[in-house]
């Protein structure tokens, strides 16, 4: 028998749902909430009239004081969740995402399921590829500028839109250093020393 003090507990008459995220940016309380068009429940309700849904997050995700990581959801994501108020259906809580056809990331297809990709809606992304004999790490800006570390630990940095700028640099190598370019300029405002 359920004690009277628990009769109105949120878990009573749980109602599950499947829906699609339609708003991720306008939460007035800035709590990371989203609006979800719940299939079969909110079909005829305008997006602006939908209630804000809380999101269940992993314990490694920051929820205060900017600690932890925050990846967030994107509009168009299919989600699974429950209504905390049961049949009233006004307190939605998102528990997880459900992939649907068309959600495949084009960068992930070639090496699926060995690579993990984190991509923002603006096109910035990180990729960790565990494909055997082709392990690599890559981080890329939406402009195309990126750095990549291959399976042997070699690093490539490519700044497509600008020139990399470093305040101080020291280059040491156990072998040969080769500089190749149509024009090579070496300028020193005080001294240029070349020793052999």
Q: Where are the predicted features?
A:
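Hydrophobic packing positions characteristic
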Residues: 1-189
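C-terminal intramolecular chaperone/autoprocessing and neck/assembly modules of extracellular spikes
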Residues: 190-196
């Amino acid at each position: 028998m359920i004690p009277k003090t628990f009769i109105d507990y949120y878990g009573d008459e749980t109602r599950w749902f499947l829906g699609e995220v339609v708003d991720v940016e306008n939460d007035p309380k800035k709590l990371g909430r989203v609006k979800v068009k719940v299939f079969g429940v909110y079909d005829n309700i305008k997006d602006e009239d939908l209630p804000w849904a809380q999101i269940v997050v992993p314990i490694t995700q920051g929820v205060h004081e900017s600690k932890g990581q925050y990846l967030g959801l994107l509009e168009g994501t299919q989600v699974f969740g429950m209504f905390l108020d049961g049949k009233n259906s006004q307190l939605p809580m998102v528990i997880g995402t459900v992939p649907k056809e068309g959600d495949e990331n084009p960068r992930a297809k070639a090496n699926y399921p060995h690579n993990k990709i984190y991509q923002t809606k603006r096109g910035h992304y990180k990729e960790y590829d565990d494909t055997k004999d082709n392990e690599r790490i890559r981080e890329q800006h939406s402009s195309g500028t990126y750095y990549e570390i291959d399976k042997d630990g070699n690093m490539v940095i490519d700044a497509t839109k600008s020139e990399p700028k470093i305040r101080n640099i020291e280059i040491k190598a156990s072998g040969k250093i080769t500089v190749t370019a149509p024009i090579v300029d070496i300028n020193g405002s005080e001294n240029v020393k070349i020793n052999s």
